[in-house]
Amino acid sequence: MKRLLSAIVFPAMFISISNVYALDIQPGEWKMENIEMRTINPDTKEVLMDEKNSGIATLMCYTPKMSEDSKKMVKGFSTSAGGCTTTFVESTDTKLINETVCNNPDVKSHSIVETTKISDTEFAMTMKSDVDAGGNKTTSINKIKQTFVGKTCSEASKGVKQ
């Protein structure tokens, strides 16, 4: 189960960190709050996790360099790291959709992330992931709200910057 959770969490982190670059996001501290997290076994339909408004939040420091780099993420742009390839299939000033495929020996996954800009200080993100970790399969749907906290990054958020 530990391996399975790692297989779910790592791609989700990779997706959300990669995803932040694609839209024009102002530099500063951002809060990423999990609104809904649901994970099932697609074979048995067993619900492994179903949390609503979990209150789990992560602070992230979005640097000026990250803001500049965001302009490079256009439709068709692709990047690879750690056995995973992310391709941006839609990229506008208000919406980003990217697809990530990971083909590692022990873990295979396919994820789609859709980010919508609500305002200059709020984004909505939906992530859908299918993971196969050594025969243990899961399907996860996560909904995240990203909210601007301020132009200055706190110590808590600085460890999360890229």
UniProtKB/Swiss-Prot annotation:
A family per Pfam: DUF3617
InterPro entries: DUF3617
Superkingdom: Bacteria
Name of the protein this chain belongs to: Uncharacterized protein YtgA
Lineage: Bacteria, Pseudomonadati, Pseudomonadota, Gammaproteobacteria, Enterobacterales
